[in-house]
Amino acid sequence: MKFIITGGGTGGHIYPALAIASGLKERLGEAEILYVGTKKGLEANIVPRAGLRFTTIDISGIDRSSMLKASRSLVKFPRSFFQAWDIIKDFQPDIVIGTGGYVSFPIVMAGTFFPSKTVIHEQNAIPGLANRNLARRVDYALLNFAEAAPYMKAKSMKVTGLPVRSEIFNVQRAESIKKLGLEPNLFTLVVFGGSRGAMTINQAMLEAVERWQDSKMQIIWITGESSYNEIKQQLEERLSLSKRRFLQLYPYMFNIEEALAAADLAVCRAGAGTLSELAILGLPAILVPYPYAAENHQEKNARALLAKKAVEMVIDEFLDGDTLYKKVNELRENPVYLKEMARNMAKEGRPNALNEILDVILTLPDN
């Protein structure tokens, strides 16, 4: 069978797509898969590393900061749609699968005009405009949150959860601690801001990190590539070499599952992909929802877990070094509650999500 998979811009759209691709290959033995992304998205680096055939179309997300910028983004759509049309016409997939991000809209939309079956996966409790529109045309809409269903006027729909990478299931805590050169008996904090980093989290960390240098804890801090050099320079100026040993600084981690498995607590955004991986590993978190996410979906994702006592939450505009320092220390000093959070987070994991998604995808040609 032949599949086109599309999803990009951020890791939250890419990694579920890679999980589906890997699952299809495992189920079918042989599957011809073409991944469609953009040259500027993270997928251009991540997907080829996964060994998948990769091609691109020319499209960018809608910039809502002004009508002029939004108009410029929309002008590109006809071109990207016809690029998508040509790709589908040439490749002739049996099924087109979209996992979100602006690149998936023209690909899946074009797919609905061909004999190919089409399926989308919506990750968030509040669907974006693209998937709301696609839902009316595709053969199947798969959901991570049941709360998304009222927004999706799809022919067929199912709540499956979000597929996570196979590495998440295979990673071991003790082995990860050893690989990363961490001390096995120290409290470990992992801090990251999504695949592109997060300015607010990075700034709060810069304000707080010196206060942790003499404490019995270790930190894995993934800054995002754009902020890495500046943060590294500041730390070198403010912390002596001996004091920096408690801190591991990375611009990006392709093996982030090892950092998550090694950690006792995470500080991060509240994207659906991130939350699904944390849930599988039972890793509690202090969530700082991205304030400009469409429909404010990250805060809604975070509040759902906050109500279940699986996470703590700090609104982005209220996060600073002092708040972060106090939040982390409160949880460090209350291991009983931290373990309760971990148990509650693990209850939210849906380890069978990928199999449910594959079952739907592979029965589509028969319908």
Curated annotation (Swiss-Prot):
Say yes or no: keyword Glycoprotein present. Answer: no
* UniProt xrefs under InterPro entries: GlcNAc_MurG, Glyco_trans_28_C, GlycoTrans_28_N
Tell me a GO biological process for this protein: carbohydrate metabolic process
The protein's annotated catalytic reaction(s) are:
di-trans,octa-cis-undecaprenyl diphospho-N-acetyl-alpha-D-muramoyl-L-alanyl-D-glutamyl-meso-2,6-diaminopimeloyl-D-alanyl-D-alanine + UDP-N-acetyl-alpha-D-glucosamine = di-trans,octa-cis-undecaprenyl diphospho-[N-acetyl-alpha-D-glucosaminyl-(1->4)]-N-acetyl-alpha-D-muramoyl-L-alanyl-D-glutamyl-meso-2,6-diaminopimeloyl-D-alanyl-D-alanine + UDP + H(+)
Metabolic or biological pathway, per its Swiss-Prot or TrEMBL entry = Cell wall biogenesis; peptidoglycan biosynthesis
Q: What function does this protein fulfil?
A: Cell wall formation. Catalyzes the transfer of a GlcNAc subunit on undecaprenyl-pyrophosphoryl-MurNAc-pentapeptide (lipid intermediate I) to form undecaprenyl-pyrophosphoryl-MurNAc-(pentapeptide)GlcNAc (lipid intermediate II).
Which family does the entry's similarity section mention? Belongs to the glycosyltransferase 28 family. MurG subfamily.
Q: What is this protein called?
A: UDP-N-acetylglucosamine--N-acetylmuramyl-(pentapeptide) pyrophosphoryl-undecaprenol N-acetylglucosamine transferase
Q: Which organism is it from?
A: Syntrophomonas wolfei subsp. wolfei (strain DSM 2245B / Goettingen)
Gene that encodes the chain: murG
